[in-house]
From Swiss-Prot:
<keyword id="KW-1035">Host cytoplasm</keyword>
<protein>
    <recommendedName>
        <fullName>Cytoplasmic envelopment protein 2</fullName>
    </recommendedName>
</protein>
<dbReference type="GO" id="GO:0042025">
    <property type="term" value="C:host cell nucleus"/>
</dbReference>
<dbReference type="GO" id="GO:0030430">
    <property type="term" value="C:host cell cytoplasm"/>
</dbReference>
<dbReference type="GO" id="GO:0019033">
    <property type="term" value="C:viral tegument"/>
</dbReference>
<keyword id="KW-1048">Host nucleus</keyword>
<keyword id="KW-0426">Late protein</keyword>
<keyword id="KW-0946">Virion</keyword>
<dbReference type="InterPro" id="IPR004286">
    <property type="entry name" value="Herpes_UL16/UL94"/>
</dbReference>
<comment type="similarity">
    <text>Belongs to the herpesviridae cytoplasmic envelopment protein 2 family.</text>
</comment>
<dbReference type="Pfam" id="PF03044">
    <property type="entry name" value="Herpes_UL16"/>
</dbReference>
<comment type="subunit">
    <text>Interacts with cytoplasmic envelopment protein 3 and with the capsid.</text>
</comment>
<comment type="function">
    <text>Plays a critical role in cytoplasmic virus egress. Participates in the final step of tegumentation and envelope acquisition within the host cytoplasm by directly interacting with the capsid. Upon virion binding to target cell, a signaling cascade is triggered to disrupt the interaction with the capsid, thereby preparing capsid uncoating.</text>
</comment>
<keyword id="KW-0920">Virion tegument</keyword>
Length: 370
């Protein structure tokens, strides 16, 4: 059995800390369901039977989620994650309406909250037994006498689904509010208005000019491979990721899975003119001739979402001459809101840059969620 939420969350409660009848404040109830809707990308179904549905989710902490998670015992990269278990039941004694459920939510196996809530779900576009969920009309209800123990569940450990963002990118034009964005990496933007990621993507035919087995086609990733120093460092590897798709706090991230990958010296030192130190032959997918240096432009000041590679990079040859870019080999693409949220919820860097929305989730169509 598990204790209720720890003392670190007392500000969430009405009444005395020691009272058996204490309740979540109405603001906290709404904050919790908004966090589970907007700050969690995907739920992985762990168990489904006539009595209960159990889901698991992992997400990088946001201010909303952090209010409900217990303080970590050690400050590790996994301490920046929320590991969430959701138990949905329909006890007859509660006389619930259609789509209403009694929901127990546990955070990091230490804090537990009890609500009655309306739940709408739809299959997630990646993997099986994955769902996107919207939680609405929450009401506080006291904890039941029998609280499940997450450690007793048979949690799948296999990593059987991987995200390749190229498979979900669709051709796009710069949005109407192309300046309302923030730069995630060279040629990668977060659209504040659309809550979605746009990026410049290499044409698939140019993969033939890349190293054997190479799959990544985002501009920032290609630039990282071209420019990063070969001995590597923590910034080059950029290992701080979780895996929301497979609901694990640790991730073996690859360039195909996250668009945060970028030139190391640009990320950690804000350098804009970088010497080619990596895979020199990759210049062929970016420029019309060999380059010694690459200048990154239009990134930090007044950024805009653009389909023009020449707006973002300048190639400099061995004699200081400018080398034209291979503009025809690159197109602007966009990810939908669900895939964008999945990437952000698994990346500590992007979660810091991309603020979670404060608005209530509205399905794009009445039939979007069951």
């Amino acid at each position: 059995m598990m204790a209720a939420a720890s003392d670190s969350c007392l500000s969430l409660w009405e009444g005395s800390a020691s009272s058996p009848n204490r309740q979540l404040t109405p603001e906290a109830v709404n904050c919790l369901t908004e966090a589970l809707t907007e700050d969690v990308a995907v739920l992985r179904l762990i168990r489904s039977d006539p009595r209960v549905k159990i889901f698991m989710a992992v997400s990088v902490l946001t201010p909303r989620l952090a209010r409900f998670a217990p303080p970590p015992p050690k400050l590790t990269h996994t301490a920046k994650c929320a590991v969430i278990m959701i138990y949905l039941t329909r006890p007859k004694a509660l006389a619930l309406q259609p789509k209403q459920f009694h929901m127990l939510v546990t955070f990091n196996k230490a804090s537990v909250y009890s609500l009655v809530v309306r739940v709408k779900t739809k299959p997630f576009p990646v993997g099986t037994q994955r769902f996107r969920a919207v939680f609405q009309d929450p009401e506080f209800i006291g904890l039941p006498s029998d609280i499940p123990d997450p450690a007793a569940e048979n949690i799948p450990t296999e990593i059987n689904d991987r995200l390749d963002v190229s498979n979900f990118a669709t051709p796009a034009q710069p949005p109407k509010d192309k300046y309302d964005c923030c730069v995630l990496a060279p040629g990668v933007w977060w659209s504040n208005a659309n809550k979605a990621i746009y990026f410049l993507q290499m044409d698939v035919a140019l993969l033939a000019l890349c190293p054997a087995g190479w799959k990544a086609r985002g501009l920032g990733i290609i630039l990282g491979r071209l420019l990063n120093h070969q001995e590597g460092c923590a910034t080059c590897r950029f290992t701080e990721h979780s895996d929301p798709l497979n609901a694990t706090a640790d991730s073996v991230a690859t360039p195909e899975s996250c668009l945060c990958w970028a030139p190391c010296l640009w990320r950690k030192a804000h350098q804009r003119e970088l010497t080619v130190e990596g895979d020199r032959y990759l210049f062929r997918v970016l420029f019309m001739d060999a380059v010694e240096r690459v200048r990154l432009t239009g990134l930090r000041r007044s950024p805009k979402i653009t389909a023009n590679l020449a707006d973002l990079v300048v190639g400099i040859g061995p004699h200081g001459q400018q080398i034209p870019v291979n503009n025809a080999g690159w197109k602007l693409v966009a990810l939908d809101a669900d895939i964008s949220r999945l990437i952000v919820c698994g990346c500590y860097a992007l979660r810091y840059i991309c603020p979670p929305t404060n608005s209530k989730h509205q399905p794009s169509s009445p039939d979007e969620y069951a």
